[in-house]
Swiss-Prot record:
Protein's name according to its UniProt entry: Gene 49 protein
Region of interest: Disordered: 1-38, 102-137
Bias (Low complexity): 29-38, 120-132
Ranges of Pro residues composition bias in the record: 18-28
Superkingdom, taxonomy of origin: Viruses
């Protein structure tokens, strides 16, 4: 490829393979009785040319990565607002939620707890986060966190109390009492 000339046919080119026949002239009709304002005509004829043109509003259903979202695009904020304040938009949102619920196996998306706020969530069950018998350990940084699981290296179970300070300041791990 040299410059913008391809050495082969571009399979994604929008140019037609053969010229299209010229459209037949449309018969003239009487002017319609509806009157549109100039701004409405401009807005209706104006297409958002690129994803960064205009304004968009994204509606994420429950905040999880797998949840659906609906993106409404318009020429300006008033255009987007006009689109979302319609019965059709509400019907669309209801339908999207119904379809998402069907594929998720539930009746609809459950609301997210707390919205996450960028905090790391633990995927361990509650029992794995609490030491047996409610045992707690402390270091110079405060209460330590109980961790248990299966070692990826050895495949053996482990249980320990870990310091919550930044990694470069952490105290040594402590092992729970064997009972």
């Amino acid at each position: 490829m040299k410059g913008n000339q391809l050495s082969y046919d571009d399979p994604w080119s929008t140019a037609p393979a053969q010229p299209e026949p010229a459209p037949a002239p449309e018969p003239e009709t009487a002017p319609s009785a509806t009157v549109t304002t100039a701004s409405a005509a401009v807005r209706d004829s104006m297409a958002v040319q690129h994803s960064t043109d205009g304004v968009s509003a994204t509606f994420k259903f429950a905040g999880q990565y797998s949840d659906p979202w609906v993106v409404v695009k318009g020429a300006d904020p008033a255009d987007v607002l006009a689109k979302v304040n319609t019965a059709e938009f509400k019907a669309l949102m209801d339908k999207v939620q119904q379809i998402a619920g069907h594929y998720a196996g539930s009746g609809g998306s459950a609301p997210a707890n707390g919205g996450g706020g960028g905090q790391q969530q633990s995927r361990a069950p509650q029992a794995a986060q609490e030491a047996p018998g409610g045992e707690k350990r402390y270091c110079q940084h405060g209460e330590m966190v109980y961790k248990s699981g299966v070692s990826k290296k050895t495949g053996k179970p482990y249980a320990l109390f870990s310091c919550t300070a930044p990694r470069d300041q952490q105290c040594d791990a402590q092992w729970p009492d064997k009972k």
